[in-house]
């Protein structure tokens, strides 16, 4: 029974730490770039776009397909940075827990 109490205590501590991390992630801002910096997209920790910058040289009708690709690439880079930041923050919390390799937590 002592083991179960200990597990429940650790789970509650982990839940509190995860809430703290989620609160911190809201304030996180990361920027993904593409085309050597011609396009940049800034996301917050909830994957919401807060800023898009496009170099004026790309705003030409004949360049629209390139611009679309660069916007997607910049967005994907920024999302990957958010995922990496969350993984780094949760790694310390889940250390020592019997979580199988590759298992994704619902909040990460």
Swiss-Prot record:
Tell me the GO molecular function terms: DNA binding
Q: Which SUPFAM superfamilies match?
A: YbaB-like
Question: Does this entry carry the keyword Isomerase?
Answer: no
| Superkingdom assignment | Bacteria
Q: What cellular-component terms does GO give this entry? A: bacterial nucleoid; cytosol
What Pfam families is this protein classified in? Answer: YbaB_DNA_bd (PF02575)
Read off the InterPro entries from this record.
YbaB-like_sf (IPR036894), YbaB/EbfC (IPR004401)
Q: Which family is this sequence assigned to? A: Belongs to the YbaB/EbfC family.
Role played: Binds to DNA and alters its conformation. May be involved in regulation of gene expression, nucleoid organization and DNA protection.
Among PANTHER family, the record links this protein to: NUCLEOID-ASSOCIATED PROTEIN YBAB
Protein name per Swiss-Prot or TrEMBL: Nucleoid-associated protein BARBAKC583_1239
Organism encoding this protein: Bartonella bacilliformis (strain ATCC 35685 / KC583 / Herrer 020/F12,63)
The organism's lineage?
Answer: Bacteria, Pseudomonadati, Pseudomonadota, Alphaproteobacteria, Hyphomicrobiales
């Amino acid at each position: 029974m002592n083991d179960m109490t200990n597990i429940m205590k650790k789970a509650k501590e982990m839940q509190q730490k995860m809430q703290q991390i989620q609160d911190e992630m809201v304030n996180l801002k990361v920027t993904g770039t593409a085309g050597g910096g011609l396009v940049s997209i800034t996301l917050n920790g909830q994957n919401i776009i807060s800023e898009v910058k496009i170099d004026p040289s790309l705003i030409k009708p004949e360049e629209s397909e390139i611009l679309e690709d660069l916007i997607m690439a910049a967005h994907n880079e920024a999302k990957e940075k958010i995922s990496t930041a969350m993984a780094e923050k949760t790694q310390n919390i889940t250390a020592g827990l019997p979580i199988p390799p590759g298992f994704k937590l619902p909040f990460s």
